[in-house]
Amino acid sequence: AKATKEFLLNLDGSCLDLLELGIPYSDPLADGKLIAQASFETAAKGVNTDAIFAMLEECKGKINKPVVFLVYFNIVFAYGVERFIARSKEVGIAGFIIPDLPFEESEEVAGLCAKFDLDLIPLISVTSQNRADKILKFGSGFVYALGAIGVSGSQRASEERLKALVEGLKKRSDLPVAVGFGVKNKNDADEVKTYADGAIIGTEIVKLTAKFEGEELIKQINKLF
């Protein structure tokens, strides 16, 4: 948590518009091998939800960029949905990406997010387009378009399919669309940004956090975009 805190406090020097902060979970279904391993290692060090809230409390008012939680629904449910959302608001979180949020829970979670003025960021893949209108109904902030079929760090879907997905989402919603999963470097990010509003890089940033720290880490991250 100490390294994460330092990273958050250095965020202003980065070119990032927003940061996803993952809460460690024992069964991270959407995460590839590398992020899952980082999650297990962090959890093994005793970093749990309360520890992350405490760290964010210490950073409050010192981070000028939005931070959203990437969190699995079981964590939210175990903590108490409203309690988790209220606490997130208190520590300065801007919204949530919940990869395994059951559709039947979406309305309640979206309602509580709205109550605390936080975003519930919808995830839509090339295979879930037929349910896009339903998913978008409860979404806010931006749309997370999944650029790969499978887990984070996977191979990207074809450019043609991705473009069609993003164009379809833009017709259905006024929310900006960012593409993640399968975006690994500056070339990928530049390509994605020709038709989407943003690019999301996860796995490669986790790799960098294992090698660098402080300002050097920020410098290396900036090279990815």
What does each model-found stretch correspond to?
Residues 15-17, 88-94, 114-120, 137-145, ...:
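Glycine-enriched alpha-helix->loop->beta-strand junction motifs that scaffold or abut catalytic
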Residues 11, 59, 88, 113, ...:
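Generic structural signal for hydrophobic
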Residues 160-200, 204-207:
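A C-terminal functional module that forms or caps the active site or interfaces directly
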Residues 1-11, 127-137, 179, 183-199:
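Catalytic cores of alpha/beta
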Residues 62-72, 113-123, 169-182:
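Short beta-strand/loop segments at the ligand-binding rim of alpha/beta enzyme cores
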